[in-house]
Amino acid sequence: MTVQMVLLTALGVGGATIFGSILCFVFKKVSHRFSDIVLAFAAGVMLAAAVLGLILPSLEYGGKYGLIFTVAGIFTGAMCLSLIDKLVPHLHKIVGADLEEHESNGSLSKVLLFVTAIAIHNLPEGIAAGVSFGSGNTSEALLIAGGIALQNIPEGMVIIGPMLAAGVSSKRTLLCAMATGLVEVIGTLIGYFAVSVASAILPFALAFAGGTMLYVISDEMIPETHAHGSQRGATYSLLAGFCLMLISDVLLG
């Protein structure tokens, strides 16, 4: 595993947010149904990645105390994100169930809080991708990074509308999207180097990363995909994402 590969993957994960923002510029108006289906598919991929690529390896690497390390890591990761959520609410908690309602008030301060929240939440997601590389399983790490990147595309699409409605210029809007993506790049590098330097923490770190991903899926992604009347489609999309990740894991494993 080379640092160059980790860096390129980190740039890809962070760049997915920018790609989503550019899509929103190109297509102007993206339907809730489309974004919900894409986000649900990403949730399925991330769910499988969290279990297959992070939590199960944590049990394996932990040896005799694997179960203790894994359970402790999962809850620690979830509680850390829960604490961040209390300090800086994210996605559906700021935007609300209806994005148009948010766009209509044009509150710049609320928009900036929204973008800051996404940036802060991107850090642990980046760390999760980096930790997976630290395990040494390149195929698993790439699948996990791919799932996180896929989730970043609709997130990047969500950033643009409220900022433009609040009067922020297109150039500054794109710069904000780039900043949120950069945070994820930094998080990926932090996660990778942390477990590379201190390999003893790998079982706990893997479970911690898995816990953060499970929290994001349950607390943010699934509620967001069910907020606009596309619950059935989102559910099947999540299952499709999960099964695709499962098939990929078996074929590449």
Where are these regions (language model features)?
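Intrinsically disordered, metal-sensing/regulatory segments
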Residues: 1-253
